[in-house]
């Protein structure tokens, strides 16, 4: 379903992920590279080897100029043509929630990630208060064209389920960033209600994890 999207869907530059790439990284795999805007930004930053995976062939052709190689296909079905422990870092920018079995993909990709290598994921938080409000008080679970209840999402995660998924796949979380709803009043709510309730304001988590 993702490959039927408006072309603009594939044209985001994921600076929110790029900022967490560890120093010393040379070889990067971007899963779901779209039209290559993130690849372009990576190229401008001088990384030695940039590889993408993209299911949408038309978008992949658009992005080829920014990558050393783009593997076209379904990430859950293709076998990656790379040596063991080839990459220093793998990016999953809003990808895992679109997969049937993201747990297995994360495990499989350990083979091409070097020991101690990094993965950086962005994943929507289904525990956001707007989703819960509509579900609990209105009985509504309404899919949308984008966002947390994007129609093409097959899996839904909370912080706890994200942590368990990564741990079971063999990764250790080293960093966590939160993108929140109502950002101007988040700090006030945090002080008033306590840190445990902040998860209800989070729209998306960005997780930095290391291969054990």
Label the model's feature ranges.
Residues 103-115:
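A short glycine-rich, Lys/Arg-flanked "PGG" loop and its adjoining helix->strand segment in the class I
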Residues 160-177:
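A SAM-dependent methyltransferase catalytic signature shared across enzymes that methylate proteins
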Residues 206-212:
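C-terminal lobe and adjacent flexible extensions of AdoMet/dcAdoMet transferase-like proteins
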Residues 89-95:
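A short beta-strand submotif of the Rossmann-like class I SAM-dependent methyltransferase core
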């Amino acid at each position: 379903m993702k490959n039927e999207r408006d072309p603009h869907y594939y044209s985001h530059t994921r600076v929110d992920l790029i900022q967490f790439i560890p120093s010393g990284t040379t070889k990067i795999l971007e899963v779901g590279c779209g039209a290559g805007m993130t690849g372009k930004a990576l190229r401008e930053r001088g990384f030695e080897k940039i590889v993408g995976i993209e299911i949408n062939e038309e978008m992949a052709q658009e992005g080829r100029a920014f990558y050393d190689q783009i593997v076209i296909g379904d990430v859950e079905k293709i076998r990656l043509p790379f040596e063991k422990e080839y990459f220093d870092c793998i990016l999953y920018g809003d990808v895992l929630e679109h997969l049937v079995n993201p747990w297995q993909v994360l495990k499989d990709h350990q083979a091409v990630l070097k020991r101690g290598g990094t993965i950086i994921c962005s994943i929507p938080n289904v525990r956001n208060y707007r989703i819960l409000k509509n579900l609990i008080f209105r009985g509504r679970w309404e899919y949308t064209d984008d966002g947390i209840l994007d129609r093409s999402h097959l899996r839904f995660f909370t912080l706890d389920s994200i942590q368990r998924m990564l741990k079971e796949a063999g990764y250790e979380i080293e960093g966590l960033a939160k993108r929140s709803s109502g950002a101007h009043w988040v700090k006030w709510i945090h002080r008033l209600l306590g840190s445990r309730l902040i998860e209800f304001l989070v729209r998306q988590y960005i997780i930095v994890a290391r291969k054990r």
